[in-house]
Amino acid sequence: MRALNFTILFLFAGIACYSQPQVGLTLIASGFDNPIDITNAGDDRLFIVEQPGEISIIQSSGTVNSTPFLDITSIVNDGGSEQGLLGMAFHPDYSSNGYFYVHYTNSAGDGQISRFNVSSGDPDIADNLSEFPILTVSQPYSNHNGGCIKFGPDNY
C-alpha cells in the first residue's frame, strides 16, 4: 500500500510539473542604441533610457516616437563600458510639476544627477535647456558606475 501511495504521489507530481503556464517573450519595439533602463511616468508610455544619451518613448500602440524625449548626447560621456546615460526617475508629482531626474556620466567622467522639465507644449518632449544639476560624484574609474535612481515609498 505504501508503495502504491508513493507511486500515485510521484505521478501527480510529474503531471503538476507539466501543467505550469508557459512563459515567453514578445518583442514590442526595437532599434534602440544600447538600452539600459525602462520606466514610465505613471501613464501608458514606456521611456527607454539609452546609454549614449537619449531617452525614447514607446507609445501604448507599440510605436516608437521618431523624436527622442530627451537628447543629451552632447554632454554625456559614454566612452567607458559602464559610462553614459545610466538612469532615470520621474518625480512622484510629475503629472503636476513635470520634473524628472537623470543620472549620467558627464564630460569629466564624473557621475551627474540632474533634474529636467518636460516641455510646456508637448508631453513627449523634454526641455533640454532646463537642466538643473543636483549632485556630482567623482568617478575615478570608467566601470562600476551604477546609475539606477528611484523614489522610495515616502516619495524621497
Language-model regions: role of each:
Residues 20-156:
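Acidic, Gly/Ser/Thr-rich repeat motifs that build Ca2+-stabilized beta-propeller blades
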Residues 1-21:
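Bacterial Sec-dependent N-terminal signal peptides
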